[in-house]
Amino acid sequence: MKSVEEQLALIKRGADELLVEAELVEKLKRGQPLRIKAGFDPTAPDLHLGHTVLINKLRQFQDLGHQIIFLIGDFTGMIGDPSGKSATRPPLTREQVLDYAETYKSQVFKILDPAKTEVAFNSTWMDQLSPADFIRLSSQYTVARMLERDDFDKRYKSNQSIAIHEFLYPLVQGYDSVALKADVELGGTDQKFNLLMGRELQRAYGQEPQCILTMPLLEGLDGVKKMSKSLGNYVGIQEAPGIMYSKLVSIPDSLMWRYFELLSFRSMEEIDGLKADCEAGANPRDIKIKLAEELVARFHGEEAAANAHRSAGNRMKEGELPDDLPELSVAAAEDMPISAVLNKAGLVKNAAVARDLLASGGVRIDGEVVDRSFVFKLGTTHVCQAGKKAFGRVTLVSEESSN
């Protein structure tokens, strides 16, 4: 096992906050594997790269020799996490949650070593709690303290309803740490309240409190809003290799180091070397290619990554993609047909030309030929090619934010 200092450096890489660092140092000094917990509510069937920020951190703990607990919130998933939500989330059925959980497992083991991963379901202990146990759990926290949460506070002050079961969510997540005897819990920055709940409940149940490590929410392809499937600015880990590759090669230069730090398994020394190369005049696109190849290989294999790179090279030969793509913005109130976006971005003379190019296969989005059915999602960014000479990295921004 690495020294405490070496472990701490890797643990803190890319992290937003570590609470409490001195406590974690003491735990590491014992020289025993720690129990590292991260919970995921399977509320959708597939994962994107934003979800993998936590999973990557779990892998780093795993490589350091610690015990990883991948917690599937099949019980909490039926409640729905209220964190950051302005309204009550519709609950899922147990069947939906379990179906999604199976797809999660197949995806996360592309990152985690299944032989060294403990998979747990929080229904295992939550289903065993008696009404008296639930009353005891609920008595550990007050409504006033719950309303200190920013999202609950905003909803309460704006007279929006808060269902009683939503108050249970952070209590159940916190109790998971009690049931698992977690030493460390990972979560996004939006989960801090819930993670701290775990510390408080562990104390209440006579356990040593866990340390918490919050990780930032990964920005989407637009480099502004967090990665989200609903915003369309995401890279799905089950997307076709060519699509994943083209999306990653097309990210803004300003975003690539963030992605390297949070998504790459390269050492920080190697990443610093790539930064130095870039500052010395290396083409940023060549650096992004390294990132794209690494991530495509992780989820699809080395051969698929090589094929994606080769296909992208062939596409470039057909219509050379310039190194200095112009950054273009189009304001809109809602999603927009690709023909209208090309016209407003100035990549075609008029909408009629756009329609002709689309009909003849002359329009590529992120390297892939598209037709007139392609819809540009509000808030997303794509590399657009109209014909052989018109290129641009186009972002569809809301009219409100452009004012």
Swiss-Prot record:
Gene3D superfamilies the record matches: HUPs, RNA-binding S4 domain, Tyrosyl-Transfer RNA Synthetase
Top-level EC class: ligase
Locus of motif 'HIGH' region: 42-51
GO MF annotation, one: RNA binding
Domain of life where this protein originates: Bacteria
S4 RNA-binding domain residues: 336-396
EC number: 6.1.1.1
Pfam family, one: tRNA-synt_1b
Subcellular location: Cytoplasm
This protein's UniProt keywords: Aminoacyl-tRNA synthetase, ATP-binding, Cytoplasm, Ligase, Nucleotide-binding, Protein biosynthesis, RNA-binding
Keyword Cell membrane part of the UniProt annotation: no
Motif 'KMSKS' region: positions: 226-230
Annotated residues for binding of ATP: K229
GO annotation, cellular component aspect: cytosol
CDD domains: S4, TyrRS_core
Family: Belongs to the class-I aminoacyl-tRNA synthetase family. TyrS type 2 subfamily.
HAMAP family: Tyr_tRNA_synth_type2 (MF_02007)
Function as written in the Swiss-Prot or TrEMBL entry: Catalyzes the attachment of tyrosine to tRNA(Tyr) in a two-step reaction: tyrosine is first activated by ATP to form Tyr-AMP and then transferred to the acceptor end of tRNA(Tyr).
PANTHER family, per database record: TYROSINE--TRNA LIGASE, TYROSYL-TRNA SYNTHETASE
Official protein name in the record: Tyrosine--tRNA ligase
Species this protein is from: Pseudomonas syringae pv. syringae (strain B728a)
